[in-house]
Amino acid sequence: MKSAALLLPLYTAAFAAAAFHHEHAQAVIQDQQLTIVEPDEYLIELSPGETRWVNENEKWELRKKNINFFDITHNAELGTLNHRINAESVKYPSKPVFNETLAPLLKELDKNNMRAHLETFTSFHTRYYKSQYGVQSSAWLLGQVNKTLADAGAINASVKAFPHPWGQSSIIATIPGKSDKTIVIGAHQDSINLFFPAFLAAPGADDDGSGTVTILEALRVLLKSDEILKGEAENTIEFHWYSAEEGGLLGSQAIFQSYEKEARDVKAMLQQDMTGYVQKTLDAGEPESVGVITDFVDPGLTEFIKKIITVYCDIPYVLTKCGYACSDHASASKAGYPSAFVIESDFKYSDKKIHTTEDKIEYLSFDHMLQHARMTLALAYELAFAEFK
């Protein structure tokens, strides 16, 4: 397989922890370059066992046709080393039990925080994972997560950049509990314009700026719990912001491949990808709802999430499907971890402006995003205190 050299910026860990500003970020990034060897062709997996070699243009053409895939060129081992607990053995609570505790926390969720964060996040020309803007936006996001932990006085919690060879790092925030059993809440931070990824604008307000700021707000409010702050929860909680989802779930594959190798005990993973668009549902005369994905997910976790929505959200759920490898929860599933995915609506009514210059804030509902934040916060708290085998 032939390869070609592509120059990409090197985003240092020191800068990652300190960067908060666009101009500062660019000044640092331009001082350092990293030579990365990019393959001429990529091995993708379109369904279990169905693989194909494609070039980069062919990858984007598949995405334009709404065909999803894993890019397994450098992640072929994902799912092959899983000798830990079978994901099917995880038993979830029969029902939510922390209604009284969560009631005051849910009132703390603020859609204005989500709007402010999303306005900045979408101001980057693109968050394409192989661009300087993608590195800068990741630096800004890492700064916001750091600030969230600091403002909460979360001295036991931590956040780190998970580096990748393409430049844009993933981000992992960890709130330790009494055990290493882990609950993961995820979203992807990158965006893409499929018509010319390296150059055209990709504000990515809904995909997946909405999920990014939704889980950030859930993290902020979760840290208002003294029990969580003091590490008194039964389980550890992690918040992930994945790089390069649009390239074939690259960032999440790298993370869950490392977790699989380390035999990490992940009890649940929820993905929040696209949480803000509701207009097409309303135009169809349907009630506002959230879409619970039912294919290629863990049935037990999905059933518990349905109960969470019923108890803690002000709108109902609908059952819907999104296909194979449709978001980062698929990487967790492939590694043997139980995962679930909740999207903004029935999949057929989801945002069609994604992957273009028109994926803008003006088309989103922050009231709807608040419902996703309620679900995320409630699930994280309920499972933080759940007792697993």
UniProtKB/Swiss-Prot annotation:
GO terms for biological process, alphabetical: proteolysis
Binding site for Zn(2+) 1: H188, D207, D273
GO cellular component terms attached to this protein's record: extracellular region
One Pfam match: Peptidase_M28
Cofactor: Zn(2+)
Propeptide part(s) removed at maturation, as residue ranges: 19-89
Signal peptide: 1-18
EC supergroup of this enzyme: hydrolase
Protein location: Secreted
Glycosylation sites: N99, N146, N156
UniProt cofactor note: Binds 2 Zn(2+) ions per subunit.
Entry keyword set: Aminopeptidase, Disulfide bond, Glycoprotein, Hydrolase, Metal-binding, Protease, Secreted, Signal, Zinc, Zymogen
A molecular function GO annotation: metal ion binding
Family annotation (InterPro entries): M28_fam, Peptidase_M28
Binding site for Zn(2+) 2: D207, E246, H355
Annotated disulfide bonds: C322-C326
Gene3D superfamilies: Zn peptidases
EC number: 3.4.11.-
Record text on subunit structure and interactions: Monomer.
Biological role: Extracellular aminopeptidase that allows assimilation of proteinaceous substrates.
Similarity comment: family membership: Belongs to the peptidase M28 family. M28E subfamily.
Protein name: Leucine aminopeptidase 1
Natural source organism: Pyrenophora tritici-repentis (strain Pt-1C-BFP) (Wheat tan spot fungus)
